[in-house]
Amino acid sequence: MLGHAVNYGSHRTRRSFSRIKEVLKLPNLTDVQTQSYKWFLNEGIREMFDDIMPISDFSGKLSLEFVDYKLLKPKYTLEEARDHDANYSAPLHVTLKLTNHETGEIKTQDVFFGEFPLMTDSGTFVINGAERVIVSQLVRSPGVYYHSDFDKNGRQIFGATVIPNRGAWLEYETDAKDLAYVRIDRTRKLPLTVLIRALGFGSDSEIADMFGESDSIRFTLEKDIHKNPADSRVAEALKDIYERLRPGEPKTTDSSRSLLYARFFDPRRYDLAPVGRYKINKKLSLKNRLLRQTLAETLADPDTGEIIAKKGDVVTHELLDKLSPYLDRDDFKMVTYEPSKEGVLPDPVTVQEIKVYSKVDPERVVKLMSNGHIADDVKHLTPADVLASINYFFDLQDNIGTTDDIDHLGNRRIRRVGELLQNQFRIGLARMERVVRERMSIQDISTVTPQQLINIRPVVASVKEFFGSSQLSQFMDQNNPLGELTHKRRMSALGPGGLSRDRAGYEVRDVHYTHYGRLCPIETPEGPNIGLINSLATYAIVNKYGFIETPYRRVSWDTHKVTDKIDYLTADVEDNYIIAGANARLNEDGSFKDKIVLARHKEDNLEVTPDKIDYMDVIPKQVVSVTSACIPFLENDDSNRALMGANHQRQAVPLINPHAPIVGTGMEYRAAHDSGDALVAKAPGVVEYVDANEIRIRRDDDTLDKYVLEKFRRSNATKNYNQTPAVKQGERVVADEVIADGPAMENGELALGQNPIIAFLTWNMYNYEDAVMISERMVKDDVYTSIHIEDYESEARDTKLGPEEITREIPNVGEDALKDLDEEGIVRIGAEVQDGDILVGKVTPKGVTELSAEERLLHAIFGEKAREVRDTSLRVPHGGGGIVQNVQVFTREAGDELPPGVNKMVRVYIVQKRKIQVGDKMSGRHGNKGTIALVCPEEDMPYLPDGRPVDICLNPMGVPSRMNIGQVLELHLGIAAKQLGIHVATPVFDGASEDDMWNMVREAGIGKDGKTVLYDGRTGEPFHNRVSVGIMYYLKLTHMVDDKIHARSIGPYSLVTQQPLGGKAQFGGQRFGEMEVWALEAYGAAYTLQEILTYKSDDVVGRVKAYEAIVKGERIPKPGVPESFRVLVKELQSLGLDIKVLDMDHKEIELRDMDDDSNDHFNIDTLSKLAEQQEKKKLAEEAAKKDDKPDEPVDESDSSTSSDDKVSK
């Protein structure tokens, strides 16, 4: 028998074809969310308060300090928050201490800091009743970056940027003449020496001594001349910088000094964050710069004087290891520079320096200067950082040091939910700090308390804004468990502080070699976001600095054998090693079988001997994301189709009776388990009781655990969220085992679709262009039937004319329309409703004009009843019919929180059972998508020799050009596994080979070619050629024809243009665009075109008259002026252009006169006739004044009434 048996949970065994043993368990797949939030609650909040506090007033008499914080019990449980459209959050209380330094009095008080949203166990937040996910952001890490380029003359120019987490950027650059410049905060450039002088090193000799005598320094010093002899060089430099940053303002040495200090050296204004300090120390440290350099001085032990390295030695890895402990010391090669007292900071600057030879001119000595040993908690820049970064910049011109690749994952980091939240909270606290300072100055010092100083509104507002409207706070994709899991593991380069879609180029979107084992190279959206939104690889974790690490097996340096010791490496650390692939063949003892092994180093693929290898991949699937790891035979698919296959799985609709794939990858169990949709046992025990609603498990220590199952809840994607028990009474369970399946699960495994019998066969052109033909059995047996739940809300509000009322007494509605409503006017649960049926009867008071005497009398006798009301009932929208599943009524009396002005709210859930039908979209796992073109009767389907009809026919033309051969291999392996009655697992890059597949086919006793004779169901004749028939996992996707089909007869119009609205959501019409107009013009269908552009569109008066004429059975009158013509005229008039409509004789026609003619004789085409009439009318009026008898018949149309008035009448 091929393969080996592997258990997934206690209910499913698969035959696995993997050859590589699993040395590392998959980490929890939602850890990227939950661990980060845990950090925020435990450390992040405290860190933030410590940054902002203590807050002192301007005189220093009062100070407010942070003591502690605590989160209390949530107001609502998770379920209540969902039902009440509320937040799942807990009150945050902070203990603050107010000290009066004059009297020594201390007041400590507990202050409420607002409700703080809590994360659910599965890594989501419930905000306003809906589950949301905070997507992690991929951003450029703070630090110092160097780059080089070539100008148009082919000269190499260099640049450097110091990027903080918060604060001003510092940029260095050279030009074609080798002059070095600096830009501070994106302003105009200055000679770089100006910045050095401003730090307190004013003379040319000091600068030359510090940075050496390179051409670049010499030229820059020559350009940077002393312009104002009244000022010292340091003062002049400070003023030059001030002028660049604040042009036009009066400059003094003091103001210039404080401005430069505030920009870079003030911890409150400038923040590198721990990661920025780590990156800068790493980049500038001599440990990382000495390798392969030739020493220009002899290095000795400072204590013993023993020589460690001689002048002229080249620093190898071994020598560097020997030097490392000395480089970490505070007394080895340290140099202290004394700045002038006029400089920004008067303190001495200590750096570590070692002399080496230039790579460009081997005779010249160059200094390597590091920033000394700056502590990790110094979050602002120091003068030592600036000097060392300038030294690195000049060293690059001597070919010492390396430039940085911005797309390298060592230079991009992840901001996870905890950090994003902390940043947002910090903004709120900073706003609050300003308010506290102001209140400290105003309030009476003796009586003030912390509570009176604090205003929590800015803090609450910033948190609310982040969860409600940030680009990274997204409505969770709840189509199926896989979509949910992927959403939590998503990495977005967009969002505040990230990239924007339009500005992102190809480089940042492209797959980088550092993505290996960190970000999936396959799963990314198609369209404008391609490459900007990625998915975390299966085994990747995020370290404390936010860099992605991936695990590798360590190879022993002595024995060159692969050990089971696992190291997690970041991308920049990995660059130092040579790494073998996971499929390198090993002996039992862990040594490499082959003399030459395929390995990677940076972006190169090498063939090396085993003694050169440092690490080995853990497992092949560490390269891809969870979704891609669910595609069997991924290695046989073209990458573009694999991308579609990964995305389609997330769009699969949970079915009524799902089945896990016969051909899986072994990833299905973990994906379902970690998604948060399955119910998992907390502890081992025995199942004591099971029904559809709850499971009770008796633990080994005799305590009883009760698990309540979710039943028929509406998910975010309007799908049915339902849990079903996966265990039986008396069954033994272990901790962390799946005991109840969520949606799209079977036996604890992900089950997104079904395993139908599929034939690659064209059938009467019904498979043309990727169309799919399915058997009627799929409909009859509910194979692809899914349940969808939609909710509709109706609110009874207070209006100006009185309150709305939810009632059964609706005007002008027959009794048959009310048959399913209860006495309150709310539909009963279980009622079957069609489009347009009333769900909630509601009446709204009409505007009442002055009442007549009779009405007043009736009013006095019968009270409110005689008031006129209009029907504003909630009705089933088009395509929304189904069965009423649940009704929720919220009222103030019952203690429910309702928005202001709302007295009662009713929510009705309608459930639909959707069978598969023509127009629905289906897909496999290999990007082989198509829509259903025909549901064929079972008896007409092609059938196998044993009489079984196939379920689905796919077009064989869809395979060769698309190069997704994985589907063909899956097809053959699937039918073999089905015949043998087993499930198989073929993990990605380590699964069944083609030979394995054919051996399995042979074992199952299927023909040598894997094909079969197929018979035509209508004639009984065999098809000419043998056909590939097998079992392939096939999904029904969320793009269903029921959601897309749309038709309009009459409906709403746009207010301004009076044209029908567009789109299904607005119940709009289809736009008759210019191309459609050309088509009718080409046919000469003038009248058809005229009515489309007038009555059926935006001729307001014309459509009312046409309606009247149809009702009365009269001739339809001629159309009037389309409203959009008026809009055009008004638009042009609003621009100050005097637009008039003229007739043939250049006489003006008034627009409103073109609208109406009581006898309907006038025609819009004969504008000149109208002008004649107007002329005659004037003459007639003049004649009437002279003598009482008119000469001409006067047209008595009401030209004074505008069309709007008529419509309202």
UniProtKB/Swiss-Prot annotation:
* Keyword field contains Translocase: no
- Region Disordered, annotated ranges: 1173-1209
Record keywords: Protein biosynthesis included? no
Q: Which Gene3D superfamilies match?
A: 2.40.50.100, 2.40.50.150, 3.90.1100.10, DNA-directed RNA polymerase, beta subunit, external 1 domain (2.30.150.10), DNA-directed RNA polymerase, subunit 2, domain 6 (2.40.270.10), RNA polymerase alpha subunit dimerisation domain (3.90.1800.10), RNA polymerase Rpb2, domain 2 (3.90.1110.10)
Please tell me which top-level EC class this enzyme sits in: transferase
One short Pfam name that applies is: RNA_pol_Rpb2_3
The EC code for this enzyme is 2.7.7.6
What are the GO cellular component annotations?
DNA-directed RNA polymerase complex
Q: Which keywords does this chain's UniProt record carry? A: DNA-directed RNA polymerase, Nucleotidyltransferase, Transcription, Transferase
Q: Which NCBIfam families match?
A: PRK00405.1, rpoB
Which family does the record assign?
Belongs to the RNA polymerase beta chain family.
Query: What subunit structure does UniProt give?
Result: The RNAP catalytic core consists of 2 alpha, 1 beta, 1 beta' and 1 omega subunit. When a sigma factor is associated with the core the holoenzyme is formed, which can initiate transcription.
Protein name (record):
DNA-directed RNA polymerase subunit beta
Q: Name the source organism.
A: Lactobacillus johnsonii (strain CNCM I-12250 / La1 / NCC 533)
As recorded in Swiss-Prot or TrEMBL, the protein's gene is named: rpoB
